């Protein structure tokens, strides 16, 4: 059905005419079903230098430790529930299992304390099974932790903490034991899911694929998905997708947006943001309250007491700001230049943008995060 060599030759010829702003298909879309899977496990970190869990306050750590010893045939005497294990910490372990991971491959893992351990620095994770959402074990984790933070405390109670010492990573710390079933080789079609749904982008993908492979090979399901015909043979399917994912697509322009982070004062204005004709003036009201208490001294032989009498001064100043006008189709550069001319701070710019949106003059989505 598909001649891979002819596809490669045709793709190389077409790539010469692509615009500089075009993006590869693999950068704007993903293949349905080809995804990573989250794994999680519970285990013990040992070898800590006295920074482990206080097991009297975290009984689950001691219980886990006793269960581990019982697996090695070691019986813990009854009544030892108050044993303090300073070098052991209960941890959660999580990892992302990449698509097509096979048994024997390794993945990175993240280890985080779930008790009251002060630091995992210098610790080693004991064998920990990692399970998926279905309850099956897909990987086994074990190894020495790499911890970027540290914690130090003096005898007088002074303390310093750098970064987060209660979490660390083990590069290649988990060995894959089971592959995740994949539907990649099933059926005669594949679905491409756009990272940012857009009807224009979906149509351009369909046009590009059909121009290369023939009419009807690609069909748009909706603004976020495109279905393409694919070879049934697995090896041909891989070659086929290697060609498709390197096609250069000119994506549609993003929706005009203005993003405001009210906590940090960050404002991001998209390139396509425009403003309808409007006039803006923004003044700043400054209220100053100063305290200048005076001392009231009683007269001699009056049997009075010296008292402090509060005296407050309140002053309000309204800073005049010039008015500036936005003409029809004002662009991002003109907005920034006009606002900078009046010396508006990020907080003032937020108020101006919100007012423009309420007035219907801001031709963009205003999103506050």
Curated annotation (Swiss-Prot):
Q: Where in the cell is it found?
A: Periplasm; Bacterial flagellum basal body
Pfam families attached here? FlgI
Q: Which GO terms describe its biological process?
A: bacterial-type flagellum-dependent cell motility
Which GO molecular function annotations are given, in alphabetical order?
A: structural molecule activity
Superkingdom assignment: Bacteria
Question: InterPro entries, from UniProt?
Answer: Flag_FlgI (IPR001782)
**Which UniProt keyword terms apply here?**
Bacterial flagellum, Periplasm, Signal
- Leader peptide range in chain numbering: 1-22
Q: Give a Gene Ontology cellular component term annotated to this protein.
A: outer membrane-bounded periplasmic space
Q: What is its main location?
A: periplasm
Similarity annotation:
Belongs to the FlgI family.
Q: Give the protein's function.
A: Assembles around the rod to form the L-ring and probably protects the motor/basal body from shearing forces during rotation.
Q: Assembly state and interactors?
A: The basal body constitutes a major portion of the flagellar organelle and consists of four rings (L,P,S, and M) mounted on a central rod.
Q: What is this protein called?
A: Flagellar P-ring protein
């Amino acid at each position: 059905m598909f001649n891979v060599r002819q596809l490669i030759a045709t793709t190389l010829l077409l790539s010469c005419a692509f615009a500089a702003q075009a993006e590869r298909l693999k950068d704007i879309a993903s293949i349905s079903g080809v995804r990573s899977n989250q794994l999680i496990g519970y285990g013990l970190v040992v070898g800590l230098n006295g920074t482990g869990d206080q097991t009297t306050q975290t009984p689950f750590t001691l219980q886990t430790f006793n269960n581990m010893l019982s697996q090695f045939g070691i019986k813990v005497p009854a009544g030892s529930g108050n044993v303090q294990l300073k070098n052991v910490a209960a941890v959660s372990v999580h990892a992302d299992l990449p698509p097509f991971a096979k048994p024997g491959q390794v993945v990175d893992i993240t280890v985080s304390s779930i008790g009251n351990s002060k630091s995992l620095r210098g610790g080693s994770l004991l064998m920990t099974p990692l399970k998926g959402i279905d309850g099956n074990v897909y990987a086994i984790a074990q190894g020495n932790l790499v911890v970027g933070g540290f914690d130090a405390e003096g005898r007088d109670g002074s303390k310093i903490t750098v970064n987060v010492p209660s979490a660390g990573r083990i590069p290649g710390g988990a060995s894959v034991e089971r592959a995740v079933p994949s539907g990649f080789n099933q059926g005669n079609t594949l679905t491409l899911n756009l990272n940012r749904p857009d009807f224009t982008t979906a149509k351009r993908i369909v046009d590009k694929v059909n121009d290369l492979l023939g009419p009807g090979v690609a069909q748009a399901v909706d603004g976020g998905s495109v279905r393409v015909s694919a070879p049934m043979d697995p090896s041909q399917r891989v070659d086929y997708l290697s060609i498709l994912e390197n096609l250069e697509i000119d994506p549609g322009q993003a929706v005009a947006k203005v993003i405001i982070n009210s906590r940090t004062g960050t404002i991001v204005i998209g390139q396509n943001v425009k403003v309808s004709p409007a006039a803006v003036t923004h003044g700043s009201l400054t209220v100053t309250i100063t305290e200048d208490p005076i001392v009231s001294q009683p007269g001699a032989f009056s049997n009075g007491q010296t008292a402090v009498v509060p005296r407050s001064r309140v002053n309000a100043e309204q800073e005049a700001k010039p008015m500036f006008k936005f003409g029809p189709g004002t662009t991002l550069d003109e907005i920034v230049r006009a606002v900078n001319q009046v010396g508006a701070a990020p907080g003032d710019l937020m108020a101006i943008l919100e007012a423009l949106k309420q007035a219907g003059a801001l031709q963009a989505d205003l999103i506050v995060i």
